[in-house]
Every structure is written in C-alpha cells, then in structure tokens.
Curated annotation (Swiss-Prot):
Family that this chain belongs to: Belongs to the tubulin family.
Listed GO biological process terms: microtubule cytoskeleton organization; mitotic cell cycle
Function, as annotated: Tubulin is the major constituent of microtubules, a cylinder consisting of laterally associated linear protofilaments composed of alpha- and beta-tubulin heterodimers. Microtubules grow by the addition of GTP-tubulin dimers to the microtubule end, where a stabilizing cap forms. Below the cap, tubulin dimers are in GDP-bound state, owing to GTPase activity of alpha-tubulin.
Binding site for Mg(2+): 69
Pfam family of the protein (one): Tubulin_C
Variant or mutagenesis effect after changing residue 124 to R: In strain: BSm300
Subunit structure: Dimer of alpha and beta chains. A typical microtubule is a hollow water-filled tube with an outer diameter of 25 nm and an inner diameter of 15 nM. Alpha-beta heterodimers associate head-to-tail to form protofilaments running lengthwise along the microtubule wall with the beta-tubulin subunit facing the microtubule plus end conferring a structural polarity. Microtubules usually have 13 protofilaments but different protofilament numbers can be found in some organisms and specialized cells.
Name of the protein in its database record: Tubulin beta chain
C-alpha cells in the first residue's frame, strides 16, 4: 500500500535520516531493534509505508544508507537504532568525496552507484505499489550533493513515473563548513530543478536560530538540529503513515503545491517547537499553532517570506483537532495577510488532518510553503558562486575529476533563471495582460 523508499546519502543525510527513523519508530511503537510493542492499532495500520515486516514481529525500515566513507555509517550502526536497519542496505565506499561534488557525481560516486541501485531495486520490488522515493542529503558537500543528485537522476531514469521528494540541507549564509559550498550547492540545485518533484529546503543557520531564539538552547548540537528536521519530516509524512480525515500523499502534495514544474522548492516549519527532552507542558490551541506555524522565525530555511509571496502552502494538523476550527483559522490567516499570497491562485492554502499526534504532544502542525522568497536563498548562493567562479578559484579540484567549466556556467545560469522565474511570478497580478510584467513597482508587503 503506497510505499516509500528512503535513501540517505553522505554524512548530513545519514545523520538526519537516523534522526528521522528514530522519530517515526517511536511513533509507530517500535523499539531499537524493530520489535513492535505499541498500544494502538493505528500504529500498525499503515506501518508498511516505511517498514517491511520481517519474521518474529520485527519491522525493518525501507531505507538505503549510502556514503563514500564508512565513518558515518559506523556511527549510525552504533547508535540507539543501529540494529533497526537491514545490514545489506548499508552501501559505502572507502575513499570519501572530500567535499568535492565532482568526486561524488562523476568519479567515486559513479563507481558505487550501481551497487546502490541494486539495493534500491530490491526494495522497490518488495513494494506492493511504490509511491515514490525520499532522499535526505546536504547540498554543500561531496557525497550528499554530488552522489545524491547522481542517484536521483538514475532513479528518475528507472522509475520515471514515481514521485521524488528530497529533504535538502542548503548551505547557510553565516555557518559554513567548507569554502566550496557555493559550487557544490549550485551544481546540485541545477540537478534538483530538473529531477526532483518536491524539495524541502532546510538550512542549518535557520535551525540554529530556532534553537537559540525559541528553544533557548545556548549551545545547540547537531543532535538538536536534526531533532527539528526529523519533526518536520515526520509531520510531512504523517498523512501517509496514519489514517486521517483529510489524507494526502507525495503526489497530492505536489499537485497542490507546484504551480510550475521548476518551482518546487518549499520552505518548512513546525509548531509547537519543543527542545529534545523538554516536552511542552502547556495546552496548545489551534490559533496558537497557526500563529506559530506562519511565524517567519519558525521557518527552517533562511529566507523571510515577508519579502515574497506564497504561491501555495499546505498545513498538516495532527492530534484531536476540530476540522472547522482549522478551516476557520486558515481562512483567517489568508484574509488577514492577503498581501503575502498571490491573488491569481484562489484557494492556495491546503490543509490535511491526522488524528495521531506526535509523541509527547497533544497536537502539532507542520507547514510547507512554496514562497517566492526562497529566491533569496538561491540568490545568496549564486552571489557566492559568482565571486569565486569569476576568479576560477578552486576549480582545479573539479576539472581534475573530469568536469568542464561549461558545466559550471550552465549551472549558474540555470539558477539565475530560477531566481528570475520566482521574481516574475511574485510580481504577476491578475489584471495584467498575458506577458506584460510591471518592472517598475515590485510589491512591497506592508506589515
């Protein structure tokens, strides 16, 4: 029944993936070795979206773990849920990609990719009716970015009609791991524009801000950041895993969220925000959830939606929530902030409900928005890219792996096109003729 095959590539992807599996195993009542000891039939009803049932009441994630060096894999294997995964589904090289996109995409990664595809094929064959794939990776490194996008395009070739969702960690403006991040990210986005159906953009800096501002953590660890990401991933996939009044799957999400095929980069948010360990002790109401969910401080990508407009957005509410209250709240948000929504897509807020709340909460909400302000994120990466590419800095690492400068130029222009497409739809209004855009007056959103 509508299975999803999950891939995690590179260090970042594997750490986020591990946090995700930990979260949803808990929600489905599985312990660290995949044995079910839950309390509710709802946990079992659609378990098979993400898990295969093995003998002895054990459930095994339909996950493929990929990396070009064994380090992160060993850490996952040694972690609390390391025994959950099927041992054959760990596919790793020995050399590492060294933050080099070309190594991940053309040399080291390309050698490993067939081995990964064999595992993916085996997982897909074990499905009744495969719905699609989800990939967790970062765009700033070598393996997740280079090999991740290679896998996406290979899977696209083999399963052209299945959905492809990616949870992509975008390099942040201030926190940088490596100097070549802008190169890796631009080359990756160039691939994602063509090959992904929906990309949820997450960025470390926004996560740091949430941890420090909202959760009051002075010194957030990657564990805390991954906890936030896994909350969102669990929220986005909740409709697939539990029965609810208004269910949704990856394809419905895409149909409702993507007005133009290239514009499939979403911002995500979650409410109520809680730190690991400290569950909120106060009752939350639907208005509060809605308020927090639409709060720019709550977005997990560093772009402020007040600088753009929403093309579409969708909200997933979990828990014992009154349908009517949710509808009223969402309508309320739209009416009060109409300047932040494009007027040429009338009912552009989609809601879905699921009756099973996350662990430790009475109710929660997950937000996915397709906002034109995501262009800020691409602009920022593009500017950094241009600054280095103009001087051909660090290029020899890429050309040495057989890449051509032309590819960089193409990726750069594709990303610039993406930015201007977002800008064009931000400024479009109903009254204008077909192709006349008002260049003089960009829309300012008044608070």
């Amino acid at each position: 029944m509508r299975e999803i095959v999950h891939l995690q590539t590179g260090q970042c992807g594997n750490q986020i993936g591990a946090a995700f599996w930990q979260t949803i195993s808990g929600e489905h009542g599985l312990d660290g070795s995949g044995v079910y000891n839950g309390t509710s039939d709802l946990q079992l009803e659609r378990m098979n979206v993400y898990f295969n049932e093995a003998s002895g009441n054990k459930f095994v994630p339909r996950a493929v773990l990929v990396d070009l060096e064994p380090g992160t894999m060993d850490a996952v294997r040694a972690g609390p849920f390391g025994q959950l995964f099927r041992p054959d589904n760990f596919v790793f090289g020995q050399s590492g990609a060294g933050n080099n996109w070309a190594k991940g995409h053309y040399t080291e990664g390309a050698e490993l990719v067939d081995q990964v595809l064999d595992v993916v094929r085996r997982e897909a064959e074990g499905c009744d009716c495969l719905q699609g794939f989800q990939i967790t990776h970062s765009l700033g490194g070598g393996t997740g970015a280079g090999m991740g996008t290679l896998l996406i395009s290979k899977i696209r070739e083999e399963f052209p009609d299945r959905m492809m969702a990616t949870f992509s960690v975008v390099p942040s403006p201030k926190v940088s791991d490596t100097v070549v991040e802008p190169y890796n990210a631009t080359l990756s986005i160039h691939q994602l524009v063509e090959n992904s159906d929906e990309t949820f953009c997450i960025d470390n800096e926004a996560l740091y801000d949430i941890c420090m501002r909202t959760l009051k953590l002075n010194n957030p660890s990657y564990g805390d950041l991954n906890h936030l990401v896994s909350a969102v991933m669990s929220g986005v996939t909740t409709c697939l895993r539990f029965p609810g009044q208004l269910n949704s799957d990856l394809r419905k999400l895409a149909v409702n969220m993507v007005p133009f095929p290239r514009l499939h980069f979403f911002m995500v948010g979650f409410a109520p925000l809680t730190s690991r360990g400290a569950h909120s002790f106060r009752a939350v109401t639907v208005p509060e959830l809605t308020q927090q969910m639409f709060d720019p401080k709550n977005m997990m990508a560093a772009s402020d939606f007040r600088n753009g407009r929403y093309l579409t957005c969708s909200a997933y509410f979990r828990g014992k929530v009154s349908m009517k209250e949710v509808e009223d709240q969402m309508r309320n948000v739209q009416n009060k902030n109409s300047s932040y929504f494009v007027e040429w897509i009338p009912n552009n807020v989609q809601t879905a409900l699921c009756s099973v709340p996350p662990r430790g909460l009475k109710m929660s909400a997950t937000f996915v928005g397709n906002s034109t302000s995501i262009q800020e994120l691409f602009k920022r990466i593009g500017d950094q890219f241009t600054a280095m590419f103009r001087r051909k800095a660090f290029l020899h690492w890429y050309t040495g792996e057989g890449m051509d400068e032309m590819e960089f130029t193409e990726a750069e222009s594709n990303m610039n096109d993406l930015v201007s497409e977002y800008q064009q739809y931000q400024e479009a209004s109903i009254s204008e003729g077909e192709e006349e855009y008002d260049e003089e007056a960009p829309l300012e959103a008044e608070e």
